[in-house]
Amino acid sequence: MLKITYIAHSSFFIETNRTCLLFDYYTGAIPKVPEGKKLYVFASHRHGDHYSKKIFDLKNEYKDVHYLLSSDIEKIEDDSISYLKDNIVYFDSNIEVSTYLSNDEGVAFMVQVDGYTLYHAGDLNNWDWIGEDKEWLDWQKNLYHTELEKMKDFDIDVAFIPLDPRLEDNYHEGITDFLKVCHTRYIVPMHCWNKYDVIERFIEEQGHKDQVLSFTQEGEVMDVKI
């Protein structure tokens, strides 16, 4: 069983029977880490809606914390922090993390922990902006598909992927492209800018109702049976 708490925007707190994971925190209430569980804190890149130095306050609250941060984030010399470039694998006795190059900034994470496989895209997405330069659009789309191909052999339990309403009618392409290549049991749309009706629109227009875990309120908690 996975316990998933939606914090804000692209930030989630995930609890397994042994481990807690915090992704892309910048604001909101962070759930308490149960005694005896290790906490891993991820930041996919330095953008203000995905990263805040406030995450380092957690070291004062918990003894067993490790930070896995994209290498574009300003460096701090601390043994509890690992800075990860794209296309590497980090592992310790509890966790294995594969990284992928974002077509925006930083990295995406594939996390294998306690028998679960979780994908957090950060800002890796099909950013098919209407009216944008075609050469740039082709570049970002090709890079997105290149990175998806690297993930296709994973059996993912939960994938956290942007569903950004600012892309207008192209809002869904990041998820639909992902589903054509990768295998996931559940999808969690994120990066919705509090316009959660885009999730219902996705289900109505694209389907996948049984795969979508819809978080529409900050602080919402869902127990997910895998």
Spans of model-derived segments:
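Active-site-proximal loop/helix segments of hydrolase catalytic cores
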Residues: N103-K180
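Structural motif
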Residues: T19-L21, Y40, H66, Y116-L118, ...
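Glycine/small-residue-rich loop that forms an oxyanion/phosphate-binding "nest" at active or ligand-binding sites
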Residues: E61-I88, I95
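Active-site metal-binding motif and surrounding structural segment of the metallo-beta-lactamase
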Residues: T27-E74, E149-F160
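Divalent metal-coordination and catalytic microenvironments
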Residues: I14, D24, H45, V97, ...
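Binuclear metal-ion centers of metallo-dependent hydrolases, dominated by the metallo-beta-lactamase
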Residues: I4-H9, D78-D92, N103-E105, Y171-I226
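Active-site metal-binding loops of divalent metal-dependent hydrolases
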Residues: S10, Y25-T27, H45-R46, D72, ...
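Conserved beta-strand hairpin/beta-sheet module of binuclear metal-dependent hydrolase folds
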Residues: M1-V33, V107-E132
